[in-house]
Design a protein with these regions (language model features):
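Pyridoxal 5′-phosphate
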Residues: 1-330
Length: 330
């Protein structure tokens, strides 16, 4: 375990260091179209340095296509990087099968587990993971601390040069309070994981059921069951996601229309486009993330507020008005 400033640094270190250390074997990397930008932008950087990257597709639920991964593997493939669970739609990936594919062909397997670590079981030996990125703030540790797990037989060099901290692999004064915090948070997450999964899954399923049954022209994004226990992501037709967020915020409800890292962007989510949604529907997305501390009463409050907000926004939508007129004539 090597401590970092967070998930983005861990992803950058894992991918760039493998690229540098194994370039004699090859310069080909495989990842997916729905990765976090910490992975996608790192791969784009490496492409500018002469590396080749294959971006494999996903199905309608956001599950990576294993056959595409296997077809993409070449003699010069050095790394497969697939996230453990998607940060926007919550879909959990078949890591064990991907790990088996990678090792069958002698390829290193990295997973960005930032969204999953502390929320679902992740055993690096059982899943065949060689490199794993995590970030503390995703499981109640302080912000600004994360880690990169590196399997002992993986030879990668330093990402930050200078002193001999972290066994000479990451220079710089260690963030001791952050390290203590992430250690305590990891311990708590492991101790309470089974109970938290049960509580979050129950609330999540209740939220999804109410939204889909009570709000017309809504859809759930991501896998219906193989998803993070605290994730619910919806699309509502004829509505802009940003408008929903503003009105929810006025009710004291925190939500997002994509990933937190792209909340300032007006472009539709690359994840929703990758699962096949058209631009106009992807623009009406809403992500609600639950914790073990949420209550059924808070879910009820949120759903009631959301129903009123959607009615209000659709009344102002020319697209919805046109849709109703067209259906009147059918």
């Amino acid at each position: 375990i090597y401590f970092t400033a967070g998930g983005s640094e861990s992803d950058n270190w894992a991918i760039k260091a493998v690229a540098e250390s194994y370039k004699e074997k090859g310069k080909h990397i495989i990842t997916t179209k729905i990765e976090h930008h910490a992975v996608l932008h790192t791969c784009e950087y490496l492409e500018r340095q002469g590396y080749e990257v294959t971006y494999v597709g996903v199905d309608e639920y956001g599950v990576v296509k294993l056959d595409e991964i296997e077809k993409a593997i070449r003699p010069d493939t050095i790394l497969i990087s697939v996230m453990a669970a998607n940060n926007e739609i919550g879909t959990i990936q078949p890591l064990k099968e991907i790990g088996e594919l990678a090792h069958k062909h002698g390829v290193i397997f990295h997973t960005d587990a930032v969204q999953a670590y502390g929320h679902i079981p992740l055993n690096v030996d059982e899943l065949g993971i060689d490199l794993l990125s995590a970030s503390g703030h995703k499981f109640h540790a302080p912000k600004g601390i994360g880690f990169l797990y590196i399997r002992k037989n993986i030879r990668i060099g330093s990402f930050i040069h200078g002193g001999a901290q972290e066994r000479a692999r990451r220079a710089g004064t260690l963030n001791t309070p952050g390290i203590v915090g992430i250690g305590a948070a990891a311990e708590c997450a492991k101790l309470n994981m089974e109970k938290n999964i049960e509580a979050q899954t129950s609330l999540r399923d209740y939220l999804i059921k109410r939204v889909l049954e009570e709000i017309p022209y809504s859809r759930l994004n991501g896998h219906p069951t193989k998803r993070l226990p605290g994730n619910a992501n919806f699309c509502f037709r004829f509505i802009e996601g940003e408008s929903m967020l503003i009105l929810l915020d006025q009710q004291g409800i925190c939500a997002s229309s994509g990933s937190a890292c792209t909340s300032g962007s007006l472009d539709p989510s690359h994840v929703l486009l990758a699962i096949g949604l058209p631009h106009e529907i992807a623009h009406g997305s809403l992500r609600l993330t639950l914790s073990e501390d949420n209550t059924k009463e808070e879910i009820d409050f949120t759903v009631e507020a959301l129903k009123k907000i959607i009615v209000r926004l659709r009344e102002m939508s020319p697209l919805y008005e046109d849709f109703l007129k067209q259906n009147e004539n059918v």
